[in-house]
Amino acid sequence: FYVPNTRSAVRINGMQRLQGEVVISDITRTHWADSYRATVAPGTTPIAGKPATELDLTATDPDNVYPTIKLWVTPDTDVPVRAQFFLASGLLFRSADFSAPVDANGRKVIRKITYRNEVEKQRASVVDILDGQPRKIPSGWFNPDTLADGQ
């Protein structure tokens, strides 16, 4: 995170909001395969009228924002359908519903994620990925001197 007139990086807390109900860790720091141990719940649960397999994810790193996540995936392809994110206290804090994957550049990607605040039920935000094209990021974006020059 860049702040003009500072010479060092400013660390952003994982619970810092990006916009609406979406926080930094929802987008950048929740790596289910690397940061969680999964246990498969028996049977299936209907989600939006379709069967889903429940995975109970337990954080392997104590610094993870969400120590526990319940994740429902399609039984045949393991595509995420819904997730519930729990705080260390056990409080259900946030949930997410995932759209069906679409083809983008020869890969299947989830285009839309709806995040819901489970404490203030009326609050929700949608992340809609409009373009899945990879882009080269200018090296100046990672240099505070270049950012200060407005380049």
Question: Language-model segments: which ranges?
Answer:
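An acidic-aromatic
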Residues: 1-25
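Gly/Pro-enriched, hydrophobic low-complexity segments
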Residues: 14, 31, 50-144
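Short, conserved active-site entrance elements at the starts or edges of catalytic domains
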Residues: 20-58
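Short, solvent-exposed mixed-charge patches
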Residues: 150-151
